[in-house]
A protein has these predicted regions:
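Non-catalytic signal-transmission and effector/linker regions of two-component phosphorelay proteins
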Residues: 1-9, 15, 22, 40, ...
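Two-component/phosphorelay signaling modules centered on CheY-like receiver
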Residues: 15-33
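Acidic, metal-coordinating helix/loop segments flanking the phosphotransfer/catalytic sites
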Residues: 34-53, 93
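Acidic catalytic/metal-coordinating carboxylates
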Residues: 37, 64-69
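Active-site residues of response regulator receiver
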Residues: 57-58
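Hydrophobic/aromatic residues positioned on beta-strands within the core alpha/beta folds
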Residues: 85-86
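Short loop/helix-cap segments at secondary-structure boundaries that form the rim of catalytic
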Residues: 91-98
Length: 122
């Protein structure tokens, strides 16, 4: 059952950080789904057609990191917006898929909410 709100999928392996992003999404008026790995995120994307934005960390365990996930999402679900985050490494525009955006960690809650609104708002 969907809420009728725009849907954001938060992909983050650190539970506390994932929960914080979910809270920001929900307080910003979105329905939030979560995944701890890219593989879990792909399964959710395959089962839901209403996801507007994937917000993913780069460094995660599993078969692919967040950048590979972002490129996979762009290839399979072109309308889905992509917001990538990381505390390490120099992520540049050339690393991101088309229309992807980068938000460095640690991020300000207001900036995260603003990015969610700009990228997935109704």
């Amino acid at each position: 059952m969907t809420s009728g709100k725009p849907v954001i999928l938060v992909v983050e392996d650190e539970a506390v950080v994932r929960l914080m992003a979910i809270i920001v999404a929900e307080e910003s008026g979105f329905e939030a789904l979560s995944a701890a790995t890219a593989d879990e995120a792909i399964k959710i994307l395959e089962s839901r057609s209403d996801i507007r934005l994937v917000f993913t960390d780069v460094n995660m365990p599993g078969s692919m990191n967040g950048l590979r996930l972002a490129h996979a999402v762009r290839g399979r679900w072109p309308p889905v917006e992509l917001l990538v985050t990381s505390a390490v490494g120099n992520i540049t525009a050339k690393d991101l898929p088309q229309r992807g955006r980068f938000l460095p960690k640690p991020y300000d809650v207001a900036k995260l909410s603003e990015a969610f609104q700009e990228m997935a708002g109704g």
